[in-house]
From Swiss-Prot:
Role according to the record: Binds to the 23S rRNA.
Source species of the chain: Listeria monocytogenes serotype 4a (strain HCC23)
Keywords: Ribonucleoprotein, Ribosomal protein, RNA-binding, rRNA-binding
Annotated GO biological process: translation
Family that this chain belongs to: Belongs to the bacterial ribosomal protein bL9 family.
Molecular function as annotated in GO: rRNA binding; structural constituent of ribosome
Annotated protein name in UniProt: Large ribosomal subunit protein bL9
UniProt-listed Gene3D superfamilies: Ribosomal protein L9, C-terminal domain, Ribosomal protein L9, N-terminal domain
Keyword Mitochondrion: no
The keyword RNA-binding is assigned to this record: yes
PANTHER family the record matches: 50S RIBOSOMAL PROTEIN L9
Coiled coil (UniProt feature): none
Amino acid sequence: MKVIFLKDVKGKGKKGETKNVADGYANNFLIKNGYAVEANNAALSTLSAQKKKEDKLAAEELAEAKALKEKMENLTVELKAKSGEGGRLFGSITSKQIAQALEKTHGIKIDKRKMDLPEAIRALGHTKVPVKLHHEVTATLDVHVSEE
């Protein structure tokens, strides 16, 4: 029997896939538990419409991420911190502080987990921070730490 998977089933298929499986397995397990539906014309047309909709949404998200990247590449986030001799900070600047400053000064809300800051900033000056906006788009944000 040909079925369309509604959920991922380990070893059998992923969501949205169309596959042939044994009739008993399809009727007694997959369809009964809501993991799949029988692949008839109506279900196939619904699946194709849903895939088109998902593709369109993914393209829109990618376009938004690219536009945000263009905007962020030209920005500088200014942060002030207390420092000692040689430009070393007392404490450090974290991705959370950068995200808050970005939202406060430029109105761009970015999740702190999207900032790829390997370790906190501990010195004065400019630092380039990569920000993963989308799995295909990474922007570079300029962070300037000056003395308070």
